[in-house]
Amino acid sequence: MDHQDKAATVAMASRPQATQLQEPVTFRDVAVDFTQEEWGQLDPTQRTLYRDVMLETFGHLLSVGPDLPKPAVISQLEQGAELWVADRGGTGACHPGWILEPEDHTLLKDQGLPKMEPSPITEKDGFAKAVPCRSMIGIDQESDGQRQALKKDQSNLNDPKEIPLQSQSHKSLGLVEACVLGLNTYLLPDISGREYGCTYDSQVKNSEHNPSLVRQRTDSPATQSFDDNGSQKAFDQIMPITELTKSQVQDKPYKCTDCGKSFNHNAHLTVHKRIHTGERPYMCKECGKAFSQNSSLVQHERIHTGDKPYKCDECGKSFCHSTHLTVHRRIHTGEKPYECQDCGRAFNQNSSLGRHKRTHTGEKPYTCSVCGKSFSRTTCLFLHLRTHTEERPYECNHCGKGFRHSSSLAQHQRKHAGEKPYECRQRLIFEQAPALIKYEWTEPLGCDSPLSQGERTQRSDRPFKCNQCGKCFTQSSHLIRHQLTHSREEEPLRGRSRRQEQPCRRGSRLIQNTNSNSRELPVAQPKAGQASRTLALFDLREIMQEQNPVHVIGVEEPSVGNSMLFDTRESR
């Protein structure tokens, strides 16, 4: 009988067993037990690895069956307590995938197999930590030839070899012949990229096995190889689990019925569905804020505890979230990966780019529910809502006065501190910027001392100059308002025609009609409740329209570099 016939015989013999393995998997089937002596031989790193794997295994079982009760060992591991499992009859199991019954021990004793001895976790060839274990073989008691082959193979058990985790079990044999701290790859197709290996050494002929000895899913016989004697070849190399489970990772059988997104695990799908349902089962005990994931709650609790584990190496600033540190580092590196396609401006955050795009589109998605006014940012909407609610959250510590904005509070506190940060060209100091602007509108720019080079540069930025006092302005409209102050100071001249032209820089000028019948404009009197300094272009238009000889055709708002022209015509 050649190798292909033998492989076919093995496949046919294992088919009934494959049907039998469709039983519900319990935590006992995948748990790993250590005696007190064995637990004491593990170092802290190995115990931490054991804890992580056991908790992750139980989590995957919960994703399959949510009603699975929580074992006591899981509760102890979650609390971080030290534990050890009592010896179960003197035979320690190095793999949780199978449990030996009393009749199994008798069978092993009759077959002359050595007892299972756990070995410490080791590293080999740079791969992840693996758990060596002795292979347990199911024997056909009716075959004497296979008994002799078994005795021959027992001599090889003293020198175990490393095999890939994919060959966990073999249907042609009777028992699982690999172990990874209780890790079953058919239950855990993805374990966060960690790689495990296990020891294996067995060269035994095909035999029918005792079904009571196996409680583990088996691999396909097509993936197994046989030597000339029909026995399975020993594997002498370790392969990463990431390679072996690549097809399993790409397979996403769990699909969301709402949006069609697929996932590898049912637990991931359960968390994703909370986005559609709005369910937030994890609530903060401090502030009552709820979250859909436990990890989000843990990150939020750092706000209350003040824990900031992520520290910047450049400036030493700490953050409670790793994403905040990543964004902060772009300040030092100058990285701006988010670029606007309309103007080419770059930003270091995607949210900043989103806000910037609204300046091009004019979108204002945030609308006030009271008055209907829209805003492009949520912060602007929140500040606007305070005008309706009369909320003043910023209160002065000295006088108790409240303000809607923090900037208004800071401006108010300068009165108590006597701080005057605004300084004019004549070295006069003001508490607030509006007071400085008012002074510049009414007072000339002249200085007793010679101007410095910096002041000359600043003056050159004010091209509009008043001919009466020499004061300069940045905008022509400011010059017009300033000239009204001079007109109120002078006594109006009536019955006298004159031609007046006030040249300004950059071609700005005021042209009045030179007709002999034209008369001087009267003094503009401010209206009730209106400050004299607030007279603007529309006030000037009203004054000119009241006079019969002069009719205003139009007043154009000036801009820097353009002429300002008042077209006047004599009324007939």
Swiss-Prot record:
Q: Where is the composition biased (Basic and acidic residues)?
A: 150-162, 486-504
Q: How does it assemble?
A: Interacts with SMAD1 (via MH1 and MH2 domains). Interacts with SMAD5. Interacts weakly with SMAD2, SMAD3 and SMAD4.
Q: Does the keyword Phosphoprotein apply?
A: no
Biological process GO annotation list? Answer: BMP signaling pathway; negative regulation of transcription by RNA polymerase II
Zn-finger segments (C2H2-type): 254-276, 282-304, 310-332, 338-360, 366-388, 394-416, 464-486
- Protein name (database record): Zinc finger protein 8
- GO molecular function of the protein, one example? zinc ion binding
Keyword hit for rRNA-binding: no
